[in-house]
């Protein structure tokens, strides 16, 4: 999908959602259908990496409002897109894989980008694959960016969690994404 013109693919996205909803309706008692419906209702085709999807899953499990994804922020350095954010709070989350920083100038460009975004009054939190290995700790870190009064009233979306799994157990046990990791892995390398 085109993040600059998301309306161009909205009909296709709606069609796919309806197809999946019909498929789930045919199997109402099958294990995992309720969770699949919850995921389908919150899914987006605009996440650009597995890490972005995993972080988005975590913020949704925590009960935070649905973040905007691939959101443009205009700065004196130009227009930059953040992976996900809450515009009303001016909080942005960036999911960073190692491939993003192959050359020294990549790191410098990213620093200028973040400086520009922060100069517009935004708080930027960077998340790596290693952070997602302990979603409980990462979740606590993310929540510190939000007003404590709001955090106190969040309702966890338990329907997005795998039955019997806990965030405290780490990504391997907390989500289906983690189930695909090789045993003993310290993290992903995108």
Question: Where are each of the predicted segments found?
Answer:
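Metal-dependent nuclease catalytic cores that hydrolyze phosphodiester bonds in DNA/RNA
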Residues: 1
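Surface segments flanking catalytic/ligand-binding clefts of nucleic-acid enzymes
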Residues: 4, 8-190
């Amino acid at each position: 999908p085109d993040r600059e013109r998301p309306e161009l693919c909205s009909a296709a996205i709606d069609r796919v959602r309806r197809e999946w909803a019909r498929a789930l309706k045919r199997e109402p008692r099958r294990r995992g259908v309720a969770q699949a419906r919850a995921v389908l209702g919150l899914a987006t085709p605009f996440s650009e990496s597995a890490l972005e999807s995993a972080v988005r899953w975590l913020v949704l499990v925590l009960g935070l409002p649905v973040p905007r994804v691939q959101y443009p922020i205009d700065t004196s350095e130009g227009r930059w897109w953040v992976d996900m954010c809450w515009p009303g709070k001016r909080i942005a989350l960036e999911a960073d894989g190692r491939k993003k920083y192959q050359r020294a100038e990549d790191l410098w460009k990213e620093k200028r980008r973040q400086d520009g975004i922060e100069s517009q009054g935004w708080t930027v939190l960077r998340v790596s694959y290693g952070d997602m290995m302990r979603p409980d700790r990462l979740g606590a870190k993310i929540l510190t960016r939000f007003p404590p009064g709001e955090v106190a009233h969040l309702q966890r979306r338990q329907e997005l969690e795998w039955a019997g799994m806990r965030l405290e157990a780490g990504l391997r046990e907390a989500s289906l994404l983690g189930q695909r990791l090789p045993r003993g892995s310290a993290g992903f390398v995108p």
